[in-house]
């Protein structure tokens, strides 16, 4: 107090004020403080002080030739005095204004190319639609999300090499561009940025944004793809949300989405093959997504999803250490347990062998629509705090947690036998048996669980066995919370092992993932997925199997031909013929095979009866184990389009049609390729063009341009007309149907209409 009074007295004297404002600061400590180091200690003050001067900027001497000494108003733009301590000129801020108005202009052609992601963002926002604002409690959970739309998926190191190669090609230093995407991007960017005048450092910085995925751990309620995250601040607050539909999609979101679909399809297909792991690897290596190899995408893309992680594990890549059960990602946050086999009896007195986790553990459970915190002891649920979007989602989480707890009352709630099987018809393990059982119907489970009175805790309410909320009672140990549970934030990845049945384990032997955990949800991929493996032919149904099988034979005809004559058994056992067997009626498979093999043997024995088209046509039928019988067939049946369709042993049919004039084969109206040699066969019928999804309007109409091949038809828009070349070089006018529902009748009417159109 005394000191302050003393200071006040001093300040009241004018001399004190003069000393403080007029005299120079010459105390060494103060001078040191403000002058040591390169770091500016008071940037705001420095800026104000500098800008108050007449010439606060220094510039290269050349500026004197480029800028007049005075502007139109006669104000000085630069000073003749040199900058102290450097060979530069002192320049006024007015010079900047003059330069901006009158300085040289440069080409703007590179701006949209360099700042591509920014321009695209503006377009997305321009075409996006913002809906109404709703006020309600937002259950946000922190998730790791992608924050810059429109990026490639290079690692920081890969991107660095690309940037150096594009922006500073003459710099020294070894740059190894190995991955396909690196090479493509480098080539593309070098072309785009030829003669680019934008500062190289700026280009490098922007390129980095475009090449590397940037993720943040942000609270989100709703869409997590990058085009939603870029407007997060506009679409959700603490107590409000604004509806928004993005005005465009970006490739990185499409890649993530398509990768998940491809991985799910591949895992599902691998599960049912003889050696799941080998099949899975074969499919991953032969699949492309949006024209890029799936294995390259898997190496670069950080998406965490059960099927994607199984594929990564198979390739020997590290994955997240959390494990999956019932579609929820579990992460242990504290405690530990040992595992012990134990036999338990269900309510139906069926014996189950389960691996019991002994010990106290806490987990976070994160699903798409619900999250929870679970505390459990040995075969006992202590507490479950769950939050979710709706009653249904909350119920799903509760069922998974109850099954995971392995409590006796859950096992005793089983009614009836447990005999769920996977796609390969193998019994599921006991924990998944229980899960499937209660996911079908959890009434008994909830009724038998028990209820308890609850205390009034802020933000928490109880939930009754019928899944209605309550403030008085709740399922034992279970509470519903308004707050979500954050996703596990760490991006740490661990080394895992995978067995031939695609079960993924960490180094302690805990199962993290298995095919049972792969979602059955079907979706339509945004990017084209090309499965080259014959195992995936059936994904698009029987017709695709049929077309692909014949395409494969034609593509590999040279090799097939030699094997056919020298080592037929090996040819018959090729895996490419496996999918085809599902099209042949079970009852006749063996007979067909015996018949075709005998026919082929006769061809080999009798010179001059080698008939290429017939061999190609009948070869897939010879792959089944043959039955010895004297049966002769004039046609073989295949099950496509919901019914049996015939392939004629001699001659053409809608299923298999060889056009002698063009030497092309069409299978179900789809082009299956060209034969290089000329097989001698009778003329093919006009029935070839069973055009699904097209209406035949009549004879050729020159107004609609030159005749298209059957292949080119797929590019037509609905309702568009075109001339098309069918069968024996005849041309008819067709229109692509506006509705898909009428496709079925096309097959029956097409043949009649073609005849009429030609005659």
From Swiss-Prot:
One of its GO terms (biological process) is DNA-templated transcription. Belongs to the influenza viruses PB2 family. Plays an essential role in transcription initiation and cap-stealing mechanism, in which cellular capped pre-mRNAs are used to generate primers for viral transcription. Recognizes and binds the 7-methylguanosine-containing cap of the target pre-RNA which is subsequently cleaved after 10-13 nucleotides by the viral protein PA. Plays a role in the initiation of the viral genome replication and modulates the activity of the ribonucleoprotein (RNP) complex. SUPFAM superfamilies: PB2 C-terminal domain-like (SSF160453). GO terms for cellular component: host cell nucleus; virion component. Transmembrane segments: none annotated. Pfam families: Flu_PB2_1st, Flu_PB2_2nd, Flu_PB2_3rd, Flu_PB2_4th, Flu_PB2_5th, Flu_PB2_6th, Flu_PB2_7th. Influenza RNA polymerase is composed of three subunits: PB1, PB2 and PA. Interacts (via N-terminus) with PB1 (via C-terminus). Interacts with nucleoprotein NP (via N-terminus). The lineage of its organism: Viruses, Riboviria, Orthornavirae, Negarnaviricota, Polyploviricotina. This is Polymerase basic protein 2. It comes from Influenza A virus (strain A/Chicken/Scotland/1959 H5N1). It is found in: Virion; Host nucleus. The record marks 627 as: Avian adaptation. It comes from the Viruses. Keywords: Cap snatching, Eukaryotic host gene expression shutoff by virus, Eukaryotic host transcription shutoff by virus, Host gene expression shutoff by virus, Host nucleus, Host-virus interaction, Inhibition of host RNA polymerase II by virus, mRNA capping, mRNA processing, Viral transcription, Virion. HAMAP family: INV_PB2 (MF_04062). Its main location: virion. A motif (Nuclear localization signal) lies at residues 736-739. One of its GO terms (molecular function) is RNA-directed RNA polymerase activity.
């Amino acid at each position: 107090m005394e000191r302050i009074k003393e200071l006040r007295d001093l300040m009241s004297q004018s001399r004190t004020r003069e000393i403080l404002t007029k005299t120079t600061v010459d105390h060494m400590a103060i001078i040191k403080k403000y002058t040591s180091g390169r770091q500016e200690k008071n940037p705001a003050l420095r800026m104000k002080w500098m800008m108050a001067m007449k010439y606060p900027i220094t510039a290269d001497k050349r500026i004197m030739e480029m800028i007049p000494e005075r502007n139109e108003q006669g104000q000085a733009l630069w000073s003749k005095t040199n900058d102290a301590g450097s060979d530069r000129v002192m320049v006024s801020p007015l010079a900047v204004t003059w330069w901006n108005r009158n300085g040289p202009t440069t080409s703007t052609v590179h701006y949209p190319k360099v700042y591509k992601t920014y321009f695209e963002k503006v377009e997305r926002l321009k075409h996006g639609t913002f809906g109404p604002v709703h006020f309600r409690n937002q259950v946000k959970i922190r998730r790791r999300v992608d924050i810059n739309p429109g990026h490639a998926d290079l690692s920081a190191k890969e991107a660095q090499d690309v940037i150096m190669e594009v922006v500073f090609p003459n710099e020294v230093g070894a740059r190894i561009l190995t991955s396909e995407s690196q090479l493509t991007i480098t080539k593309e960017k070098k072309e785009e940025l030829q003669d680019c005048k934008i500062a190289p450092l700026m280009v490098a910085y922007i390129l980095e944004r475009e090449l590397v995925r940037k993720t943040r751990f942000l609270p989100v309620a709703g869409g997590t793809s990058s085009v939603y995250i870029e407007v997060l601040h506009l679409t959700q607050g603490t107590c409000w949300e604004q509806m928004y539909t993005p005005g465009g999609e970006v490739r990185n979101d499409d890649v993530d989405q398509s990768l998940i679909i491809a991985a799910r399809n591949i895992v599902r297909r691998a599960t049912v093959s003889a050696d799941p792991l080998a099949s899975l690897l074969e499919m991953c290596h032969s699949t492309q997504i949006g024209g890029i190899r799936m294995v390259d995408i898997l190496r670069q893309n950080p998406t965490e999803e059960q099927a994607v992680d199984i594929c990564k594990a198979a390739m020997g890549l590290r994955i997240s250490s959390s494990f999956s059960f019932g579609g929820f990602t579990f992460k242990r946050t504290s405690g530990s347990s040992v595992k012990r086999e134990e036999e338990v009896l269900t309510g139906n007195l069926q014996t189950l062998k389960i691996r019991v986790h002994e010990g106290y553990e806490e987990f976070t459970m994160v699903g798409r629509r619900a999250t929870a915190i679970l505390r459990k002891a040995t075969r006992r649920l202590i507490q479950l705090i769950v939050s979710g979007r709706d009653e249904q989602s909350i119920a799903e989480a509760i069922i998974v947690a109850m099954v995971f707890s392995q409590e006796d009352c859950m096992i005793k709630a089983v009614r009836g036998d447990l005999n769920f099987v996977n796609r390969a018809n193998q019994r599921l393990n006991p924990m998944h048996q229980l899960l499937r059982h209660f996911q079908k119907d959890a009434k008994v489970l909830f009724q038998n669980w028990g209820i308890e009175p609850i205390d009034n805790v802020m933000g928490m309410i109880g939930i009754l066995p019928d899944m209605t909320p309550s403030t008085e009672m709740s399922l034992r140990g279970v509470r519903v919370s308004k707050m979500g549970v954050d996703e596990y934030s760490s991006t740490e990845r661990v080394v895992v092992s995978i067995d031939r049945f695609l079960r993924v384990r960490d180094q302690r032997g805990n199962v993290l993932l298995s095919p049972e955990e792969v979602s059955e949800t079907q979706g339509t991929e945004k990017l084209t997925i090309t499965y080259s493996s014959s195992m995936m032919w059936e994904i698009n149904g029987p017709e695709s199997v049929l077309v692909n099988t014949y395409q494969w034979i034609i593509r590999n005809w040279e090799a097939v031909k030699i094997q056919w004559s020298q080592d037929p058994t090996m040819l018959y056992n090729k895996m490419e013929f496996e999918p085809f067997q599902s099209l042949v009626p079970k009852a006749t498979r063996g007979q067909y095979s015996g018949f075709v093999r005998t026919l082929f043997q006769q061809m080999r024995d009798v010179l001059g009866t080698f008939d290429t088209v017939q061999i190609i046509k009948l070869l897939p039928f010879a792959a089944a184990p043959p039955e010895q019988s004297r049966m002769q067939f004039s046609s073989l049946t295949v099950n496509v389009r919901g019914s049996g369709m015939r392939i004629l042993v001699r001659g053409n049919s809608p299923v298999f049609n060889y056009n002698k004039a063009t030497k092309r084969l069409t299978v179900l109206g789809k082009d299956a390729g060209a034969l290089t040699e000329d097989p001698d066969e009778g003329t093919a019928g006009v029935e070839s063009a069973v055009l699904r999804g097209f209406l035949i309007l009549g004879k050729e109409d020159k107004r609609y341009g030159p005749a298209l091949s059957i292949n080119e038809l797929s590019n037509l828009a609905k309702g568009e007309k075109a001339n098309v070349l069918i069968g024996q070089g005849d041309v008819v006018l067709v229109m692509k149907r506006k509705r898909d529902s009428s496709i079925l009748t096309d097959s029956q009417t097409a043949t009649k209409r073609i005849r009429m159109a030609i005659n």
